[in-house]
Amino acid sequence: MKIFVILSVLCANLIAENRLSEKQAGEFVELALSGLNKEFPNKPGIFLKTAEDLKTPREISPVFFGHFDWHSSVHGHWTLVRLVRLFPKAEWSVKARAALDEKFTKEGLQKEADRLRRFKSFERMYGWAWALRLGIELRALDDEQGRKWAAAYLPVEEIIVANAKAYLPKLDWPIRCGFHPETAFPLGQMIDWSRATGDEEFEKLLIVKARQFYRGDRAYPVRYEPSGNDFFSAGLNEADLMRRVFTKDVYRKWLGLFFPAFDLGNLSQPVSVSDLKDGHLVHLVGLNLNRAWTMRGIAGALDGEEKEIFLVAAQKHEAAGLKDTFSGSYAGEHWLGSFAVYLLTGVGQ
């Protein structure tokens, strides 16, 4: 509860600066560390081929077994790597690095890669997206320890990219929803990874699919959002993706057709959350954070009054989302810190 109070007091400053102080970052580090090796409760999301697949989460996934589920564990690790990189001299960075060094072993990460090779649809594509985002951050941590971790992590990146390259040509339609299966968010993350690593073949495939799925979309039905357990805005994720695909002029024209008259309707106001302890209803906290970061990303590709429309709405959503990030309930705290750090440190922008 102490952390919640501290963050609530600082919300206004976070919005004004759109950045984290070392102290604030330390609160998110503590939150991420608290779930890093927390094996239970756990939702392993496994497909059982044989009786031998019945194992504990740690046996199944020797690195990413904490934080309730695989993808949350991945972005919990990402949170630590990103904050260690942004605040290398922070007192808490020593503890965070030590925890990561215990987890990022060559043997453990190879087992993670082997699992992804065996179960090719596991965490498709939401978990894949976060795993590649972690890869971007590891590559950017340009010191001896970071290079060691990045080298050990390479097999995970390689199999995810191989799985994506095999899957995407067969995916004929986008998946439009407000939670894990949605396609616009992972396509955006994968484009960022392909550009960070220079994988032009992968980038070309991703842009082709983004154009195929979304180029012709018009008059997005904003009145249909949100659904009751969304943590994504399908419409804003799509718009945030397409700024990565189009030139600035083409993007503005497309966006004006996608959101006619740049009227955001329901998307302009934060959503309320009735129960922060309910694992599905608390998704709506993540929705507020997701709306805020996508709106900021979209605003970065616009000018003048149109830019202001998105920035004003983003501020409202940021305040609402940060207020509920530290709830004291593991239902939200096992994952919401990563969404907040993604927003507050300007990822993808």
Task: Name each model-derived stretch.
Residues 278-325:
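C-terminal hydrophobic structural anchor segments
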Residues 7-16:
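Hydrophobic h-region of N-terminal signal peptides that target proteins for export
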Residues 59, 74, 83-197:
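Extended ligand-binding groove/face enriched in aromatic
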Residues 17-22, 57-74, 113-129, 170-183, ...:
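Solvent-exposed loop and edge beta-strand segments that line ligand/cofactor-binding
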Residues 18-20, 34, 74-90, 129-145, ...:
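Well-ordered alpha-helical scaffold segments within catalytic/enzyme domains
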Residues 28-41, 95-114, 152-173, 201-222, ...:
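Long, well-ordered core segments of solenoidal/helical folds
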Residues 17-65, 329:
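Low-complexity, Ser/Thr/Pro/Gly-enriched N-terminal "stalk/linker" regions
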Residues 1-7:
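Sec-dependent signal peptide recognition
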